[in-house]
């Protein structure tokens, strides 16, 4: 209900004027293809410490009488860069319904500079607003000094009004984020109550952007 596509590692962001001027997109363009065509090599499902078979027909045997204290789903991705490298993504679900996401990039020498590294979550419907605890305004690694820590609510999810659309909306050093929406693709719902998705840091603060377009669309 919250996801339009399966979450995947992302290596590409929208270009900026500085990128175009320095020809960054030419030097690091291989990450665009890696972002678009990343290959999932392996899926592991672990239930209470025991590995399960993740594919049909074996995974059709789970009924309402099957219980577990913890489920871990691990994905191993391989990039189509030269040389290739791998990214490990694991989702750990506990009995409370909380999902912990861990992402590990296995770096190798010889690859160009990263445009960005993270996870992309695409929602099926537009968000109304978001609330977060972190730095004020748009912040980037070189623009954090002028920001203030606090809790901020953003109701305008449109792009920053640059003459040429480009990367925007980044929020650095975030402790938690709450995305609110009231529209879904669930036709069985007759109410229009707001729904909230909360994302919290594990041990380190994170950066995020919440935009109505993907990087390739921008």
Q: Model features per residue range: what roles?
A:
Residues 1-218:
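Beta-strand/loop-rich accessory regions of lumenal/periplasmic or secreted enzymes
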């Amino acid at each position: 209900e919250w996801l339009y596509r399966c979450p995947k590692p992302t290596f590409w962001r929208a270009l900026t004027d500085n990128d175009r001027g320095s020809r960054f997109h030419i030097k690091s363009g291989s990450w665009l293809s890696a972002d678009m065509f990343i290959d999932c090599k392996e899926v592991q499902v672990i239930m209470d410490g025991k590995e399960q078979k993740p594919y049909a027909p074996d995974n059709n045997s789970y009924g309402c009488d099957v219980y577990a204290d913890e489920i871990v789903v691990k994905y191993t991705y391989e990039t189509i860069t030269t040389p290739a490298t791998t990214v490990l993504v694991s989702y750990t679900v506990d009995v409370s319904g909380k999902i912990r996401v861990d992402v590990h990039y296995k770096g190798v020498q010889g690859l160009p500079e990263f445009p960005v590294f993270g996870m992309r979550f695409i929602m099926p419907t537009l968000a109304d607003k978001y609330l977060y605890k972190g730095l004020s305004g748009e912040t980037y690694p070189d623009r954090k000094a002028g920001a203030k820590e606090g809790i901020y609510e953003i109701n305008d999810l449109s792009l920053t009004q640059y003459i040429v659309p480009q990367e925007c909306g980044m929020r650095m050093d975030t402790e938690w984020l709450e995305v609110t929406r009231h529209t879904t693709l669930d036709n069985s719902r007759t109410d229009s109550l707001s729904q909230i998705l909360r994302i919290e840091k594990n041990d380190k603060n994170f950066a995020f952007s919440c935009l109505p377009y993907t990087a390739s669309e921008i």
